[in-house]
Amino acid sequence: MKILALDLASESCSAALWQDGTLIGRDAPAARGHGGQLLLMVDALLDESGTALSALDAIAFGRGPGAFTGLRLAASVTQGLAFAAGLPVIPVSDLRAMAQQLMTPPDPAARVLVCHDARMGEVYWAGFVSIEGCAVEDTAEAVARPADMIARARSWLEAASAAGAGSGFAAYPALAPLGAQLARLAPGIRPRAREIALLAAHDGLGAALPPEQALPVYLRNDVAAIPAASALGPSGPRPM
């Protein structure tokens, strides 16, 4: 299976290519006009692998939650590439992708509590368990104030020990007592296309959707609609 993965949910821009068990990726700080930056990464990955866009099985993307502008742009780029090549899309939770980073050898965690700064005094959070080495949602993704998250997360942590991932633990001092309950803490973890590609390959084409359903998941309601495909910029995706 060949899957291209894209992510713009945080301050980073990343792309990855899963090709029959081999994973290659590109990561960089997101620059102004990062839709074009993402397309350059895609071109580089396809060139390195000797693969044409049309030869892929699907395009995966980080569907959120995360930075609103980045989510919209990632969905728009995904749609444009998928329509151009006649490919389906596979949406992957960015919180799940963060949990996956701590479920990967050499020291894989069995359970991960993800807490990502959502700004405006709130966090995105969810609990995940490892099943056959892949992150599976164990509590519903939510956006909440730190105090509300603590009340709900403590009961989940009582079941078994867990690791913690995400910027929320560092952004809100109120979460320090919760962080102290964790076996280990990785506040610097951000979503990456590598884990999105891995999880999409695990989920398979049964999770694939038509390109028009490449839509962000914000967990907040006060967000503008996805931009038109013209957000790709004047050049758009290269012909394949």
Where are these regions (language model features)?
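Patatin-like phospholipase
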Residues: 8-28, 173, 184, 200, ...
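N-terminal beta-alpha supersecondary unit
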Residues: 1-65
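Acyltransferase
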Residues: 184-240
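Phosphate-handling active-site elements
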Residues: 47-54, 82-92, 107-110
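Residues at secondary-structure transition points
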Residues: 29-37, 68, 72, 76, ...
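Surface "functional belts" at beta-alpha junctions
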Residues: 33, 88-191, 218, 223, ...
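DPxDG-like acidic metal-binding loop motif
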Residues: 60-94
